[in-house]
């Protein structure tokens, strides 16, 4: 088969013909095969739609999660081995204890920030902003993905010393993979780029991120509903459940293949008595636990938001964060690791345990103060005993109550300080462990008050402090994140459902306090970082129904009549840098007929140069006509009325992911509302002057 290439040379008026032979045998067979493959692709996409990509998303994230856990486990074991080999040399053990997390944290910060500054933190506040319709550049790029994976692995390898997790970053990582798979789907299927499809993939990705950390698909989907989206389409349930189930199943299956488990079991094993896990009078103490978690959650949210803002405002820390972020992270790691050194204050903080071991020990079904009083000779082993992790909380100088209280007080401010580090890190697992410690302290206190148990109907049942820890974990984490899905997460992660009613009660009570008094952890971060995210209207007391759009809209807008010429367009386009401009029927009626994009106006100016400025020869090449004839005017499919209330406008902005909307009165354009005006109106009503 041959192909003729024609090369034309204008100057010499010569034409050269080159005949190039291309070997393509069996043209008919090749044409038939290509046709059948195209039909197969169309059939598969018609049947499966985007299910293939959701399956791939779940499997990829499960592989990444397992690989990261495996790597972190080896790194932590190496650090533990090094501590053991150094023997009784306290100085070398101290240097080993602090240098390890300092090096990892500094490298995590430096590596991630050198690739992209958007890789720090959990990523959930930014993802919430993206799901609300705002475009944030480079937050979902593959470059950011690589920086976050390497940085997060180093962060987790620092161990429980830094007291950080991986849930938030994994939601962010899952969203990056989903965005990439979405672009791949567009190119493979030959579809146009659909923002709705992209939004659906990102919502499913949030569920996958949680499910591949805890192996909990149901709570992952509920997390994506509660935390990530202001409005959730029911059709996304199937996508979320399918992708999350695939991810959770593969993640748990890999643990079996790696001989970590004999079969698919709970991530955090418990051994509570199922036949009679709690007595009815204990519901009073469960309610108290919910109140305690709610109040401490409010204090934590306030202090965390204040410190995060203070670090950005303070001249010393802001200069350090601007010029040398790894140094700031190293200094914070030095402070925290020095405090948690096991030969010093760390012996009262169970600092030798990993995050998973901390949670498992707090869920222990023994009553610690009774066990220690009956076995006063118990002493901690030089090595961590995996069968008696709870002994790490025992100390001859402190009671169990003192150790737990000291842990809660110290971890409260150390974790708040760790959240200011500009490196990839998650903050859900720490608050989950912190809540378990609060619950354990309350449970041990109740067991001290009723050492024989609470009698009901002549039957005395002992108090199980581990059950209180199991309720405190979802209650406190739910209070901090303003979610109820943490209750279901506790059920799925432990395989325990005996305390279902007390857990839900604790979570609801704790949420009642924090939702009334403080924004959630993620919303607070959005506020401090000043991300373009609409605040929620949480109370009807601010009279959002009584405020009309006319009261907070921006009446100063640039409009173009349909018959606008060169001078009119030039005047408007130089007066503002808007991306689009409203077009009216004429200057007298001001009836809105559509919008025109800024690039079209620039092209209009380039092709319709002013005849007054053009020379005699240039006038012949100029196009004639006005704006309506030369530009494509897009119709306005949505607009607000001056009588639309603030509450209705806010609801529509969230539901339709709007960035701005024009305001009309009897068809005449009178102003526009952007997210800036909406946010200011809500803040003015919530905080009247």
Curated annotation (Swiss-Prot):
InterPro entries linked to this entry: CBS_dom, CBS_dom_sf, Cl-channel_core, Cl_channel-K, Cl_channel_volt-gated, ClC
Q: Please give the family membership noted in the entry.
A: Belongs to the chloride channel (TC 2.A.49) family.
Name the gene that codes for it.
clcnkb
Q: Which GO terms describe its cellular component?
A: chloride channel complex; plasma membrane
Q: Where are the transmembrane segments?
A: 52-83, 92-112, 142-161, 162-181, 237-256, 283-311, 326-343, 402-422, 423-442, 502-522
Main location as per UniProt: membrane
Entry protein name: Chloride channel protein ClC-Kb
**Origin superkingdom:** Eukaryota
- Describe how it is modified after translation: N-glycosylated on a single asparagine, probably Asn-365 or Asn-375.
Record's subcellular location:
Cell membrane
Key words, A-Z: Calcium, CBS domain, Cell membrane, Chloride, Chloride channel, Glycoprotein, Ion channel, Ion transport, Membrane, Metal-binding, Repeat, Transmembrane, Transmembrane helix, Transport, Voltage-gated channel
In what residue span(s) does the CBS domain sit?
Answer: 553-613, 630-689
Query: Does the keyword field hold Metal-binding?
Result: yes
Q: Which CDD domains match?
A: CBS_pair_voltage-gated_CLC_euk_bac, ClC_1_like
Ligand binding (Ca(2+)): 260, 262, 279, 282
Residues binding chloride:
122, 428
Gene3D superfamilies in the cross-refs:
CBS-domain, Clc chloride channel
**Which lineage ranks, top first, belong to the organism behind this chain?**
Eukaryota, Metazoa, Chordata, Craniata, Vertebrata
Glycosylation-annotated residues: 194
Q: Name one GO molecular function term.
A: chloride channel activity
Q: In which tissues is it expressed?
A: Expressed in two distinct regions of the kidney; the proximal convoluted tubule and the diluting segment.
The species is: Xenopus laevis (African clawed frog)
Q: Which SUPFAM superfamilies does UniProt cross-reference here?
A: CBS-domain pair (SSF54631), Clc chloride channel (SSF81340)
């Amino acid at each position: 088969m041959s192909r003729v290439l024609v090369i034309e040379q204008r100057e010499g008026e010569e034409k050269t013909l080159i005949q190039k032979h291309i070997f393509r045998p069996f043209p008919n067979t090749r044409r038939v095969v290509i046709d059948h493959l195209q039909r197969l692709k169309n059939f598969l996409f018609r049947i499966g739609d985007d299910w293939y990509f959701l399956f791939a998303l779940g499997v990829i994230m499960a592989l990444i999660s397992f690989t990261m856990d495996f790597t972190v486990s080896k790194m932590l074991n190496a650090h533990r081995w090094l501590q053991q080999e150094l023997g009784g040399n306290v100085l070398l053990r101290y240097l080993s204890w602090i240098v390890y997390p300092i090096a990892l944290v500094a490298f995590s910060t430096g590596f991630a920030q050198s690739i992209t500054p958007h890789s720090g933190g959990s990523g959930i506040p930014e993802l919430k902003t993206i799901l609300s319709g705002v475009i944030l550049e480079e937050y979902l790029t593959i470059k950011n993905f690589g920086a976050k994976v390497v940085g997060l692995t180093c962060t987790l390898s620092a161990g429980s010393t830094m007291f950080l997790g991986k849930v938030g970053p994994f939601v962010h990582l899952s969203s990056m993979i989903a965005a990439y798979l979405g672009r791949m789907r567009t190119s493979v299927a030959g579809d146009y780029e659909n923002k709705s499809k992209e939004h659906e993939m990102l919502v499913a990705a949030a569920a996958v991120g949680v499910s591949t950390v805890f192996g909990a698909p149901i709570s992952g989907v509920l997390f994506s509903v509660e935390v990530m989206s202001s409005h959730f389409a029911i059709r996304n349930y199937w996508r979320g459940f399918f992708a999350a189930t695939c991810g959770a199943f593969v993640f748990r299956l890999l643990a079996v293949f790696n001989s970590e488990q004999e079969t698919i079991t709970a991530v955090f094993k418990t051994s509570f008595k199922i036949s009679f896990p709690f007595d009815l009078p204990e519901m009073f103490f469960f309610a108290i636990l919910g109140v305690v978690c709610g109040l401490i959650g409010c204090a934590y949210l306030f202090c965390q938001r204040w410190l995060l803002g203070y670090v950005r405002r303070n001249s010393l820390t802001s200069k350090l964060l601007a010029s040398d972020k790894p140094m700031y992270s190293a200094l914070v790691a030095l402070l925290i690791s020095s405090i948690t050194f096991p030969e010093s204050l760390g012996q009262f903080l169970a600092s030798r345990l990993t995050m998973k071991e901390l949670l498992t020990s707090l869920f222990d079904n023994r009553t610690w103060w009774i066990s220690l009083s009956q076995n006063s000779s118990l002493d901690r082993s030089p090595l961590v005993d995996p069968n008696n992790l709870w002994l790490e909380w025992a100390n001859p100088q402190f009671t169990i109550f003192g150790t737990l209280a000291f842990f809660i007080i110290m971890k409260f401010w150390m974790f708040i300080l760790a959240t200011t580090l500009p490196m990839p890190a998650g903050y859900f697992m720490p608050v989950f462990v912190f809540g378990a410690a609060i619950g354990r302290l309350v449970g041990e206190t109740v067991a001290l008050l009723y050492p024989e148990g609470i009698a009901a109907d002549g039957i005395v049942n002992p108090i199980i402090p581990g059950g209180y820890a199991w309720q405190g974990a979802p209650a406190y984490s739910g209070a901090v994140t303003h979610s109820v899905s943490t209750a279901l997460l506790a059920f799925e992660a432990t395989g325990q459902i005996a305390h279902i009613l007390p857990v839900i009660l604790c979570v609801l009570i704790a949420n009642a306090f924090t939702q009334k008094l403080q924004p959630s952890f993620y919303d607070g971060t959005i506020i401090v970082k000043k991300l373009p995210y609409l605040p929620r209207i949480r109370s009807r007391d601010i009279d959002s129904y009584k405020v009309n759009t006319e009261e907070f809209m921006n009446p100063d807008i640039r409009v173009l009549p349909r018959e606008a010429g060169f001078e009119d367009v030039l005047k408007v386009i130089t007066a503002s840098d808007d991306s689009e401009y409203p077009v009216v029927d004429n200057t007298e009626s001001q009836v809105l007929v559509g919008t025109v994009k800024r690039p079209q106006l620039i092209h209009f100016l380039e092709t319709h140069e002013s005849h007054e400025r053009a020379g005699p020869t240039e006038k012949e090449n100029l196009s004639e006509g006005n704006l309506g004839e030369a530009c494509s005017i897009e119709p306005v499919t949505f607009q607000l009325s001056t009588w639309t209330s603030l509450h209705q406008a806010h609801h529509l902005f969230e539901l339709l992911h709007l960035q701005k909307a024009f305001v009309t009165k009897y068809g005449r354009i009178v102003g526009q509302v952007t997210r800036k005006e909406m946010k200011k109106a809500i803040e003015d009503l919530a905080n009247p002057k």
